[in-house]
């Protein structure tokens, strides 16, 4: 089975959205909502609602958050729950049901308008996506981010194609991203890609510039490449193993996500193909079993639209 690398999927996603723009999402109509998602869906919610008052949560803490804010719910200070789920299945179904049991209006952002969660949500924003390997979720969440940021996908692709890898890029054992504070929410998305693509085999870490000052670079190492995005880096990592990537003045979350994912895809190309070796076993065996489901996951998630 042909499994595309992450950098390929990034470029394919940008080409797709250049020709099929996602729906425009105006978050100003939500007043202090719960924004719930799993993994990178939660981080996508944080990005979409950046600069606005919102309560960001996930499947692990949604009920605890609802309990903590029960007085605000009772007083109608909180009226909405936004659930973000590419599949519209798994945890998103009970999250919608739970929000409705609290008397909250529910809005679902999904790539599957016929999904179980979509059938019960009050409002559904449906996003198109390309076919891509399970867990990548690049076009899925990128479409949602672009719908709020209104960045130009063609301009993003043009920028990342100007990025030249430093010599011996693939020989490093570890990679560290230092991101502008504005784009802090991208950092955990990068680390989720590390888990999915490499597991314990390759070290990739990502932090904002501010968080990087908190003892993240106590150990300079010639086998770690420190990748500074948007800001020069005079302090962190071995002095001979730093890579600075300037950003265009109008850079948004979509560009920074695509850039970091693109670089992760280049690392994927340079290393043994851990993901390709293991993803089929995960999707057909212990992955769905962990959810108590007999159905297998699709190794290649089909396109929507």
Regions from the PLM with identified roles:
Residues 14-29, 157-171:
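A short, well-structured juxtamembrane/interface segment
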Residues 23-78, 169-214:
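Anionic-ligand anchoring segments at beta-strand to alpha-helix junctions in alpha/beta enzyme folds, i.e.
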Residues 186-267:
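Internal helical hairpin/lid segments
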Residues 252-305:
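Charge-biased C-terminal accessory regions appended to nucleic-acid-, cytoskeletal NTPase
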């Amino acid at each position: 089975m042909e499994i595309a690398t992450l950098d390929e999927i990034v470029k394919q996603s940008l080409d797709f959205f250049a020709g099929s723009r996602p729906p425009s999402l105006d978050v100003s109509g939500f007043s202090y909502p719960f924004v719930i998602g799993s993994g990178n869906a939660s981080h996508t919610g944080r990005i979409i609602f950046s600069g606005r008052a919102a309560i960001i949560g996930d499947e692990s803490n949604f009920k605890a958050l609802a309990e903590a804010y029960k007085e605000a719910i009772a007083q109608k200070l909180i009226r909405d729950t936004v659930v973000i789920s590419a599949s519209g299945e798994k945890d998103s179904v009970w999250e919608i049901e739970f929000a409705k049991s609290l008397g909250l209006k529910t809005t679902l952002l999904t790539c599957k308008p016929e999904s179980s969660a979509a059938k019960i949500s009050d409002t559904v924003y449906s996003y198109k996506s390309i076919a891509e390997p399970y867990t990548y979720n690049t076009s899925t969440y990128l479409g949602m981010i672009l719908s709020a940021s209104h960045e130009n996908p063609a301009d993003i692709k043009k920028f990342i194609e100007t990025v030249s890898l430093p010599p011996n890029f693939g020989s490093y054992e570890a990679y560290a991203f230092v991101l502008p504070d504005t784009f802090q929410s991208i950092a955990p998305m990068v680390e989720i890609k590390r888990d999915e693509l490499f597991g314990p085999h390759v070290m990739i870490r990502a932090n904002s510039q501010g968080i990087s000052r908190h003892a993240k670079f106590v150990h300079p190492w010639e086998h770690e490449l420190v990748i500074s995005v948007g800001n020069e880096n005079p302090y962190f990592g071995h002095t001979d193993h730093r890579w600075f990537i300037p950003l265009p003045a109008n850079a948004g979350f979509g560009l920074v996500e695509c850039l970091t994912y693109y670089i992760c895809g280049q690392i994927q190309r340079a290393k043994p193909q851990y993901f390709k070796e293991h993803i089929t076993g995960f999707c057909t065996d212990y992955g769905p079993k962990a959810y108590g489901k007999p159905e297998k996951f699709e190794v290649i998630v089909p396109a929507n639209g």
